[in-house]
Amino acid sequence: MDETATSSEVTETFVSDPTTRQFEEDGHPPLETRHLNMIHEELEKLNISTDVINKMEVQLDLARADFRETQVQWSEKLKELSKQYSSQIAKARPFYELKIKERSLREESQKAAERFERATSILGIAKQQVSLTQESLSRQTSVLPECLEVLNHHIQRVREVEEERTAAESLHASKAHAMLHLAEKIRAMEKDNRYAIKKSRLYFEKRLEFTKILEAQKATILCLEAEVRQKKNDYTTSLRNLERISERIHEERSTGSLESAVSSDQEDQKSDFKSSESLPGNPPPYAPTAPPPYEDKYIIDKDDDSIVLNMIKTEQEEEGEKRNSRSLGSGVILLAQQLIGNGNSTEKHNITPPRHGEEADISYHTRPVGLSDGSDNSEVSSLASFNIGDDDTVSKMLMSHSELIKDIELATDRVGHILKPNIKSVSNAHE
């Protein structure tokens, strides 16, 4: 107990003193958090075990002192009674010994009776199982070996329970016979020593009370001793855990010193490599980036469904008819302009004036409102870039209003003759 108290004081001072946690005096780095947590946990267990051991040992000492005091007090009382009734106690002692023996026989007989009753109930259940199994086998046309095995198991169980029942019955009978024989002896002794038994009754009653008190105190002492033994085992386990943690810390530090030396060499190599990489060098060569390839989002693959292609074709034909009917007048005018341009192309090729800056490329587009750019020559007329020179050149290119109207009428007639067969083919296709 003193050693445990001193160890508890040492552990408490270790926990309370923060300077002992620092390892700077030995030249070691501070402990990691997980190691500190493990050490703190084991030290808490040590402190708790020490407190419990100290309290239980105090209780154990008190219980032992009470046991000794009770034993001394009752021994003195029994000695006084034995001196007072010495002759009567000597005559009545065999009677009370037989009474104690009778009590033990009664308890054994009670246990044998309970065993017999239990075996009887189990035997009834086993016999019922055997009868049910036999009935089920009698209803079957072909008896399976598994069913026979179950029946044999139930029969074997019945035999075992019958043997248990017979043994319990014989034991109960023997205990009952012994009790009857002992009861006859007790009656005979009580008849012969009635006066001595009556005088010494106080002594034996006090002795029985004294025995009960001592047995209770003895049970308390044994319980406290078992608890103290368990807590001491916990204390030694915590000490061993602390030793393991200390060994682990030393191993990690020894391996960590080697790893730190290797890592320092690697870091030096990396720093040298980074310093060599940090030197300025020539810029990378120029790599021109090409524009992204043209992607036609409206191209239809050949593997597409033929139904979709037919629908698109019919829609395109309907839109073509609408455009032809809607832009007939505008198309006539554009064709007339093209014819006029073709008629004057000879004169344009002969004239090659110099080009000037922004006026060198001029295109004229005349298309109906709402139509998009496409490959249809009837809707878009792109005049070649006119080279504008002096006033004489401009005057040759211009025409009077009346001549332009006549040319437009002639172009209209030509377009009418050209479009008639196309319109007929379209109508036949719709039909």
UniProtKB/Swiss-Prot annotation:
Q: Which InterPro entries match?
A: SH3BP5
The UniProt keywords, alphabetically, are: Cell cycle, Cell division, Coiled coil, GTP-binding, Nucleotide-binding
Q: Which residues form a coiled coil?
A: 149-171, 214-247
UniProt feature, compositional bias: Polar residues = 1-21, 255-264
Gene Ontology molecular-function annotations: GTP binding; protein kinase inhibitor activity
Asked if the keyword Coiled coil belongs to this entry, the reply reads yes
Describe the inactivation phenotype.
Answer: Viable. Double knockout with rei-1 results in a smaller brood size, weak embryonic lethality and severe mislocalization of rab-11.1 and prolonged cytokinesis in embryos.
Composition bias type Pro residues, residue spans: 281-293
Regarding protein family, the annotation reads: Belongs to the SH3BP5 family.
What the protein does?
Guanine nucleotide exchange factor for Rab GTPase Rab-11.1. May spatially and temporally regulate the distribution of Rab-11.1 to target membranes during embryogenesis. May play a role in cytokinesis, probably by targeting rab-11.1 to the cleavage furrows.
Subunit-level organization: Interacts with rab-11.1. Binds preferentially to the GDP-bound form of rab-11.1.
Q: Please give the name of this protein.
A: Guanine nucleotide exchange factor rei-2
Q: Which organism is it from?
A: Caenorhabditis elegans
Q: What taxonomic ancestry is recorded? A: Eukaryota, Metazoa, Ecdysozoa, Nematoda, Chromadorea
